[in-house]
UniProtKB/Swiss-Prot annotation:
Alphabetical list of PANTHER family matching this protein: O-SUCCINYLBENZOATE SYNTHASE (PTHR48073:SF2), O-SUCCINYLBENZOATE SYNTHASE-RELATED (PTHR48073)
Keywords in alphabetical order: Isomerase, Magnesium, Metal-binding
InterPro entries: Dipeptide_epimerase (IPR034603), Enolase-like_C_sf (IPR036849), Enolase-like_N (IPR029017), Enolase_C-like (IPR029065), Mandelate_racemase_C (IPR013342), Mandelate_racemase_N_dom (IPR013341)
SMART domains: MR_MLE
Note describing how the cofactor binds: Binds 1 Mg(2+) ion per subunit.
Pfam families membership: MR_MLE_C, MR_MLE_N
Name the UniProt record assigns to this protein: N-succinyl-L-Arg/Lys racemase
Binding site residues for substrate: 26, 51, 161-163, 191-193, 267, 295-296, 320-322
Keyword Magnesium: yes
Protein EC: 5.1.1.-
Cofactor field: Mg(2+)
Length: 369
């Protein structure tokens, strides 16, 4: 089997509500969709959702890298040879994990369809039967965040990820307000998105949060400062998660060596796709570090890819892949049974793509043959 053509679609996914985190606000989510064709008529879909605050890639640069650098090198290659595909991509250009993830996901979709198996069967088989779905609370004033959490409990949600990271005192008020409103039996995870910057600010915040039964604090400091995460972990009993600070095996080795995290957040857009995500999970398992699979607020394409990784690995104990629930329109049909997610047994990614919606949401496109 050979890759004969790769279509690229730069789309914007409309959000139900603005998505607000420590370093930005989004009214829609820009994404690059890859449609990979083969000489056997099998088509695979991939996705890259860039975040220039995390990997240094943008929507435009990801499209450009795919069009001019990666896809020309892959025409004629066998998408089943995923180790070789990644080696070729790495030898062609350093970094750009989001662009590489889009190719990787499309290859796995093709592999699954060729073998008539869901992707999770190609990377270890199904370990988990279901995962709870966590609702993500965007940054707002304390009362509004508490009110949104209360309304989501009525819809069945039992866990929340709170976005904070603007000001330590205000963030503490936000977390206290949500905990007071939802009670002690609801899970709360706090994602700072690097917003507390350093260990001093973080330790100040943590001293005020110890009594609030927080599941974990995610990436409070600047991504590259793994030393600070290790220092904070030595000073607190609150579990710490590293997100932006983990991209590749290089950072994972440092995290393990410094004992810098209780848990890590693996994202396909940060590491380069399904294949490297599995490698990270295996590294973490050897060190006894639990994993989560998260996302950059992706469509059904990349979200389903993340779920396949999560469902196949024992060491992955939580997921935050809620992008499709946040869009008014999506190009795929990934199904959620809120408050749970359960995967089907369809081959490949297990989703159908609505080509009409894909064209409707496309801002610009191209094809490489």
């Amino acid at each position: 089997m050979k890759i004969t053509a790769i279509h690229l679609y730069a789309i914007r996914l409309p959000l139900r509500n603005p998505f607000v985190i420590s370093y930005g606000s989004y009214s829609d989510m820009p994404s690059i969709i890859v449609k990979m064709e083969t000489d056997e008529g099998i088509i695979g879909y991939g996705e890259g959702v860039a975040d220039d605050h995390v990997t240094g890639e943008s929507w435009e640069s990801t499209f450009h890298t795919l069009k001019h650098t990666l896809t020309p090198a892959l025409i004629g290659q066998n998408p089943m040879n995923i180790e070789k595909i990644h080696d070729m991509m790495d030898n062609t250009i350093y970094g750009v994990p989001t662009a590489k993830a889009a190719i990787d996901i499309a290859c796995f979709d093709i592999m699954g369809k060729k073998l008539n198996q869901p992707v999770y069967q190609l990377i270890g088989g199904r370990y988990h039967e279901e995962f709870p779905v966590t609702h993500v609370l965007s940054i707002a004033d304390p009362e509004n965040m508490a009110e949104e959490a209360a309304s989501m409990i009525q819809k069945g949600y039992q866990s929340f990820k709170m976005k904070v990271g603007t000001n330590v005192k205000e963030d503490v008020k936000r977390i206290e307000a949500v905990r007071e409103r939802v009670g002690n039996d609801i899970a709360i995870r706090v994602d700072v998105n690097q917003g507390w910057k350093n260990s001093a600010n973080t330790l100040t915040a943590l001293r005020s949060l110890g009594h609030l039964n927080i599941d974990w604090i995610e990436q409070p400091v600047i991504a590259d400062d793994i030393d600070a995460m290790a220092h904070i972990r030595s000073k607190t009993d609150l579990p710490l998660m590293i997100d932006e600070g983990l991209k590749s095996s290089r950072e994972m080795r440092q995290i393990i060596k410094l004992e810098a995290a209780d848990k890590v957040n693996i994202k396909l857009m940060k590491c380069g796709g399904i294949y490297p995500a599995v490698k990270l999970a295996h590294q973490a398992e050897m060190a006894g570090i639990e994993c989560q699979v998260g996302s950059m607020v992706e469509s059904s394409v990349a979200s389903s890819a993340g779920f396949h990784v999560a469902f196949s690995k024992k060491i992955i104990t939580s997921v935050e892949l809620t992008g499709p629930l946040k869009f008014t329109k999506d190009i795929g049909n990934l199904h959620y049974d809120v408050p749970f997610i359960r995967l089907n047994e369809k081959p490949g990614l297990g989703i159908e793509i609505n080509e009409d919606t894909l064209q409707e949401l496309t801002v610009f496109q191209d094809i490489v043959r």
